Amino acid sequence: GKGWSPGSVEESRRTRNPAGVKFASCDEFMAKLPAGKPFWSWFSSRHPHRPWTDARENKVGLRPEDAVVPPHLPDHPTVRDDILNYACEVMDFDREAGEMVRLLEARGLLDDTLIVMTSDNGWQMPRGLANCYDSGTRIPMALRWKAKVLAGQSIDAFVSLADLAATFLEASGVPVPEDMESLSLLPLARGETQAGRDAVFVERERHANVRQGDLSYTVRGIRNREFRYLRQLNPDRGP
């Protein structure tokens, strides 16, 4: 995957990759780690990004009748097949993540490593990717850090990907600046009670220019526990 847009150093005329040094595999990265030194790395998978694998070809036992079709999508066999293909892609990512966890364990690094698994957007369906509806902004997130993250809990709280900044600072022993809007997730992960957020803000600006004239569908929004308010800044561009 790419850590920034457009993702090509050559096309942007940059002299270095702003996302950091790129490695061919997680195994290669770990092989080059200095012994006893802290490290930070991120893995951006192409799963579950379209094009999706045909679930029937993978023979994973998924059945169209088992698919859960959201109310805003038509309950049609084609849609059900697409949902199964998406589920198959999620399983592919799960296998990739499992391989990296096993590599950490084999090198004796697993228990001392904070692992964050999340996504940058919802699935690539209507109201999903590059949209500010819940199916586009409500994404999975899981943390693992033995002895420092309470395992097996499910947290019902508003969090933002911006909160990863403060989370990584705290995990590294670096003070979080008082004027930083990012909130560390570690207190919640430890099972502690904290004030947290009562709403999250979302926006869409330039991503996925799918309107005439290579224009985007600019949106600003806020989501609390009761309502979602979205404002289209350029309504003349259509939905």
Spans of model-derived segments:
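Active-site segment of extracytoplasmic enzymes that catalyze sulfate/phosphate-ester chemistry
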Residues: 1-3, 8-14
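Glycine/proline-rich active-site loop of Rossmann-fold NAD(P)-dependent oxidoreductases
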Residues: 176, 195-196
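Acidic, His- and aromatic-enriched active-site or binding-groove loops in soluble protein domains
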Residues: 13-30, 38, 199
